[in-house]
Amino acid sequence: MNQKDSLDKRVDLPEKFVLTDEFKDIFNQMENTKTNLFITGKAGCGKSTLLEYFRQKTKKNFAVLSFTGLASLRVRGNTIHSFFKFPPRFIRQYDPDIRLHRNPAVLKNLDAIIIDECSAVRADLLDAIDESLKKIEKMKKFLEGYRLF
């Protein structure tokens, strides 16, 4: 199966899935507010299930990104580097290799960017994401106008 097939394939929620009040609250925040969220928890607590529930129920346009290729396959997303076309190295501030996104309309139409395992993402990559988005929207503040989960 290639990556596109894995991105398009629907994944069923776990058989024992129960929509708890906590899940409802988090989904409501993801769906109806402009709040940036940092969702954390130990292995098996339901983070991936929440992502799949959001993927199936949302009306939002969003991208799912991760730091590594293996992680991006697991969440049916893209790597940060491939999505933004970043070079595979440390990225300096105002790096000339941070260019306008290959398809600015894709970024302009996004309601949210979900970064899986965000705590593993280096600071230079977060800065590069911010710089790349600023080239699209002329933002003034860090990640202004984009929601991160």
Where are these regions (language model features)?
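Conserved ATP-binding/catalytic motifs of P-loop helicase motor domains
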Residues: 1-149
